[in-house]
Amino acid sequence: GIPTVLFGIVTLYYLTDKPSDATWLTNEEREWLTNEMATEAAAIKGANEDYSIMKALTHPSVLFLGVAYFLVVCEGTYGINMWIPQMLKQWSNMSTTEIGFIGALPFLCALISVYIFGWSSQKHQESKWHLNVAVLMASISLVAAMFVESTFATMVCLCIGAAGIFACTPLFWTIPAQFLTGTAAATGIAVINSIGNLGGFFGPTAVGMVKDATGDFRYGLLLLGVSVFIGGIMCFYMNNRYQGKVNFEKAHEDASKLD
């Protein structure tokens, strides 16, 4: 809570709207970054139809990604976040203190996973298959939790599941950047995020309802695993649809000829 508010204040006054206004960059850095962004925006625009703000609000690809974000990231993230303490209470005889420490392990795994996937994606300049691997990690491990008995094995599944879901988040956002630029990108990303964040309500609610109906949280994890897998298929489709249409290398070559 408090760190987020403090960083929000810093961001408000420190981060600028565009690179050319960033006083903390050198003149050379500002010029390079401005040209780089203009070149990439031109490449995206040349490979896709022009999106206005209003069109971005209702475009099928934007709405489709909103549902994918709901299924892959938000429903799973919030569904796990909300219920981990109750899950551990049901599966073990741990004290409240022990539940607090053990319940933090999935998020520690998620922290490590986000760093590793981000580093690898950046190093190899590839995001589609990194996202696919993260989706499979999450969906398979959450479904596997249905078929194990011990608390230890279930927690291993939960840790791998959380690692996969959290790793999906930054990789997912490379998809809309493939066909949205400028103000349309800001609008489209806001729409995707708004639809996806409905998972903050539906994820925990669905897990709770399934637990009440079956008496076991493992069925709730099964639901989350299936949801992540379906959303992953949607992301795979969108990546295949747009990835490769944008030729950044050609755009940079064309831009260099103008220098």
Where are these regions (language model features)?
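A late C-terminal transmembrane helix in Major Facilitator Superfamily
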Residues: 179-216, 224
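C-terminal transmembrane helical hairpin of 12-TM major facilitator-type secondary transporters
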Residues: 125-175
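Extracytoplasmic gate region of multi-pass secondary transporters
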Residues: 54-118, 169, 173, 203-204
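Helix-to-loop junctions at the C-terminal end of transmembrane segments
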Residues: 113-126, 211-212
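Small-residue (Gly/Pro/Ala) motifs that create kinks and tight helix-helix packing interfaces
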Residues: 7, 11, 85, 117, ...
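A generic transmembrane-helix signature of 12-TM secondary carrier transporters
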Residues: 1-8, 135, 139-142, 157-158, ...
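Central mid-sequence intracellular linker of multi-pass
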Residues: 1-53, 237-255
